[in-house]
Amino acid sequence: MISGSEYHKEYMKGTTTVGLICEDGVVLATDKRATMGNLIADKEAKKLYKIDDYIAMTIAGSVGDAQSLIRLLSAEAKIYKMRTGNNMTPLSCTTLTSNVLHGNRHYPLLTQLIIGGYDLINGPKLFSLDPVGGINEESSFTATGSGSPTAYGVLEAEYKSEINIEKGLLIAVKALISAMQRDAYSGNGISLAKIDKTGVTLYSDEEIENLVKKVTKKK
């Protein structure tokens, strides 16, 4: 019988997620494969979530831990909006997430997160968090999961400061394609979102396929 800790360790082996900060917003992207050891447990795993009108999050690690946290954050964002009439800022959401993770540091939620959002006053924001609540505010890009070393190679080569979302989407897709080609624990398609002054936009499979064709055509 597999223990809880062993179960979590199995699920931490897979995934590639990336986030890029652009001049006019943020781009988030993930693969769709969930693994349990060497088994592909799910080919349509959801790893990209809308938290609020202007905030989205990617997950890597234990699916159950991450989903529980997402439910909490979504509820808190709704309560905040009901009380204040305003959307929670990306920094506020990240701080809340950090506090929850740190509060569970003795029995940590085994997940690594990227939070992207658009602050109507301060513009696009991108953060990464470790399982015990450590926050890094990113000024360019970040990646998590087993495919991240390969993704970082593409991001380092392709990313330039002050790129727009249109270019950022293509870079994110290229990074995911490269990671899925090299990492056995990543694959089965891409999930993609942008966050700008109009809010969170989740891309359809057809829209993503068109971006994939643009990227592969350039090779």
UniProtKB/Swiss-Prot annotation:
Keywords: Autocatalytic cleavage, Cytoplasm, Hydrolase, Protease, Proteasome, Threonine protease, Zymogen
Function in brief: Component of the proteasome core, a large protease complex with broad specificity involved in protein degradation.
InterPro entries in alphabetical order: Ntn_hydrolases_N (IPR029055), Pept_T1A_Psome_bsu_arc (IPR019983), Pept_T1A_subB (IPR000243), Proteasome_bsu_CS (IPR016050), Proteasome_sua/b (IPR001353), Proteasome_suB-type (IPR023333)
Entry annotated with the keyword Cytoplasm: yes
GO MF assignments: threonine-type endopeptidase activity
Activity regulation comment: The formation of the proteasomal ATPase PAN-20S proteasome complex, via the docking of the C-termini of PAN into the intersubunit pockets in the alpha-rings, triggers opening of the gate for substrate entry. Interconversion between the open-gate and close-gate conformations leads to a dynamic regulation of the 20S proteasome proteolysis activity.
Coiled-coil ranges from the UniProt annotation: none
Family affiliation: Belongs to the peptidase T1B family.
Reaction it catalyzes: Cleavage of peptide bonds with very broad specificity
Example of a GO biological process term: proteasomal protein catabolic process
Subunit field text: The 20S proteasome core is composed of 14 alpha and 14 beta subunits that assemble into four stacked heptameric rings, resulting in a barrel-shaped structure. The two inner rings, each composed of seven catalytic beta subunits, are sandwiched by two outer rings, each composed of seven alpha subunits. The catalytic chamber with the active sites is on the inside of the barrel. Has a gated structure, the ends of the cylinder being occluded by the N-termini of the alpha-subunits. Is capped at one or both ends by the proteasome regulatory ATPase, PAN.
Protein name: Proteasome subunit beta
